């Protein structure tokens, strides 16, 4: 636990504009100025029409799919994982690995340059909903809840992005 807290202290936190996060996994903090207005301005009713009930629960209400239930957990195809809500590219299959946790795991987000995630499709937000701090991962374009990132992944990044399959859309590489 102490190792996790030390790792979280070193990560940049993003501040919030406006509305509070709903559901059990959010701290209510949001980033400023990095979200595309057209993607995040959909109403709750519009998201419910666009998404399946499970996709809506996970991405818009900050839920979590059951471990070992996701369609991409054992996917070994080469390609890119996109946001199911807005189609933003998020993770490459090149950085996917088996963590044994029951969710697809990635060592870094697509577009990362070392520790610089400014060119990725994700944002990190502190999540204290379960009584201990952890880092939530959301889509930069539409604020979809994707999962969490933990400091116990493989080298060289040491990160484990633990992502809900239902929040992703896989696009295989063209041969």
From Swiss-Prot:
Q: Cofactor binding mode, per the note?
A: Binds 1 zinc ion per subunit.
Q: Which controlled-vocabulary keywords does the entry list? A: Metal-binding, Mitochondrion, Oxidoreductase, Transit peptide, Zinc
Q: Record's Pfam families?
A: SelR
Query: What protein name does the entry list?
Result: Methionine-R-sulfoxide reductase B2, mitochondrial
One GO cellular component term of this record is: mitochondrion
Using the UniProt entry, state which stretch of residues is the transit peptide: 1-42
Family, per entry = Belongs to the MsrB Met sulfoxide reductase family.
Organism in which the protein naturally occurs: Mus musculus (Mouse)
Q: Record's superkingdom? A: Eukaryota
As recorded in Swiss-Prot or TrEMBL, the protein's gene is named: Msrb2
What EC numbers are recorded for this enzyme?
1.8.4.12, 1.8.4.14
What cofactor is needed? Zn(2+)
Q: Which residues bind Zn(2+)?
A: 83, 86, 139, 142
**Which GO MF terms are attached to this record?**
actin binding; L-methionine-(R)-S-oxide reductase activity; peptide-methionine (R)-S-oxide reductase activity; zinc ion binding
Any GO BP:
actin filament polymerization
């Amino acid at each position: 636990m102490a190792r996790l807290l030390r790792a979280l202290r070193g990560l940049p936190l993003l501040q919030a504009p406006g509305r509070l996060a709903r559901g059990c996994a959010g701290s209510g903090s949001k980033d400023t100025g990095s979200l595309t207005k057209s993607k995040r301005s959909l109403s709750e009713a519009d998201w419910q029409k666009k998404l399946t009930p499970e996709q809506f629960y996970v991405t818009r209400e900050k839920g979590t799919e059951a471990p070992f239930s996701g369609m991409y957990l054992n996917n070994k195809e080469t390609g890119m994982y996109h946001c199911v809500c807005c189609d933003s590219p998020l993770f490459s299959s090149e950085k996917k690995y088996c963590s044994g946790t029951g969710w697809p795991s990635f060592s870094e987000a697509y577009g990362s340059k070392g520790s610089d995630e400014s060119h990725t499709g994700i944002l990190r937000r502190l999540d204290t909903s379960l009584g201990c701090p952890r880092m939530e991962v959301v889509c930069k374009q539409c604020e979809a809840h994707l999962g969490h990132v933990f400091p116990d992944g493989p080298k060289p990044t040491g990160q484990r992005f633990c992502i809900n399959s239902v929040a992703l859309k896989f696009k295989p590489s063209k041969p």
